[in-house]
A protein has these predicted regions:
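Short, conserved beta-strand element in jelly-roll/cupin
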Residues: 105, 131, 138-156, 203-205
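Short, structured patches in soluble enzyme cores that scaffold and shape functional sites
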Residues: 116, 121, 132, 149-153, ...
């Protein structure tokens, strides 16, 4: 659906101004959207997942280990398909305000893909370079979006996620190098035109 057609649909959660702002800047923030009680359940689940990796020494297609991972000090980069691991995760994806927001911005027919945990540890970790998420998807249709939920408070001191407002209106940059190898990042040559000087940090309390 076009943005004009989507905006004609009755909203389930967002105001019309919020919907229009999304199409203008390409993202929205909802501080403290997820309740403290919901977050506590998630934190327990995450702790169990981390503990379960103490005996793992190499990454798999579902669990990506951070460099320096040990049984004594487990460090993960990401865990995929978390919605398959616990019914609470699936409820957040399918029976919460999140699918209502998705419908307000994508149209009434929404398809869920998967839920993933990204870990950002203290004392450094793997660098995440400037990239465009759509380049990671096996889709040619641009009508997709990601929802990110902070399980803990995120401040500027923690090196938070940054986004470039309105960059969705610009070009999709190549994420392969000159040897046609996947890099998962915008090339240094393209960064000068990607608008990174206009980037804004996404910070907020847990549940944002």
């Amino acid at each position: 659906m076009s943005s004009q057609d989507i905006l004609k649909q009755p909203a389930l959660f967002l105001t019309q101004n919020q919907r229009e702002l999304y199409f203008e800047q390409g993202y929205l923030m909802f501080p403290g959207l997820i309740s403290t009680s919901e977050l506590e359940v998630f934190r327990v689940l995450v702790s169990k997942i981390v503990d379960s990796t103490r005996t793992i020494t190499s990454s798999s297609n579902k669990i990506d280990l951070e460099k320096g991972h040990t049984a004594e000090n487990p460090r993960l980069r990401r865990v995929t398909y978390v919605d398959d691991k616990d019914p609470h995760c699936w409820r957040l994806c399918a029976d919460s305000v999140i699918p209502d927001i998705a419908a307000d911005l994508l149209g009434p027919d929404v398809r869920f893909r998967d839920m993933m945990l990204n870990f950002k540890w203290a004392d450094g970790g793997a660098e995440v370079k400037w990239h465009q998420d759509i380049c990671f998807y096996p889709h040619t249709h641009l009508g997709s979006m990601q929802f990110l939920v902070f399980l803990e408070e995120v401040s500027s001191e923690q090196g938070p996620l940054q986004v470039i407002p309105a960059s969705h209106k610009g070009p999709i940059f190549e994420h392969y190098d000159d040897s046609n190898e996947w890099t998962g990042a915008i090339s240094p040559a393209d960064l000068s035109t990607a608008g990174i000087d206009d980037a804004t940090e996404l910070t907020g309390p847990a549940g944002t």
